[in-house]
Amino acid sequence: VILVLKGERVLIGHPDGRVVVNPTGNSGLGKAGNGDTLAGILAGFIAQAARMDIDIFETVVAAVYIAGMAGDIAEKKFGKRVMTASDVRECLTEVFAELE
């Protein structure tokens, strides 16, 4: 079991005791719908990793990082008080473009 503890700083725990503190994201991600967005990103990444025999823990770390980056972009564009889960999802294309 890999544990993802969602908060202003998301913690990702591995059964062997490793814990990663995600450096991206902000308190605006605590609003309704952003947990669902994160779950969808995680599901998509894990499905691809399983097909390509990629380490699932590293995949979860990457997915959480990217979700946080989208949240950071949404905060800059809309402000964390008013940003929504839809805003975060829309910012994913900018994240992927930035990472290419």
Question: What are the functions of these language-model segments?
Answer:
Residues 1-100:
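Small-residue (G/A/S/T)-rich helix-start motifs and N-terminal tracts that mark the onset
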